[in-house]
Amino acid sequence: MKNESLLSIWIEAKHIIEPLCEDLPVLTDEPGDWRVETPSGRPFITLRIQKSHVGLYVLPMYYHPHIRPRSMDAYLKGKSTFRFVRTKPLPVEGIQDIIERARAMIGTY
């Protein structure tokens, strides 16, 4: 884990995302690193503590950028990565929305 002080943000984000992915295979489940894949074995999402942020990597969004809710623009870094830091509250509804939209793309990327 690159920064233990971000563990509370990571845990909060995981608690938001995990129920939306409960039927998908979990590849890694360690403190600070959680990876989920599709039933066919493609990467789906990764939630990982980095040096200065908690990153949410949403692979379907890389191929289908139109699924990104505009409410998440302030957190977007790159094509399919969201960064969460201590200074901003987690956008619970935005996270739920992006995971639901990404699930609809399973099998199309």
Each model region followed by its residue ranges:
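Charge-dense, helix-prone N-terminal extensions
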Residues: 1-109
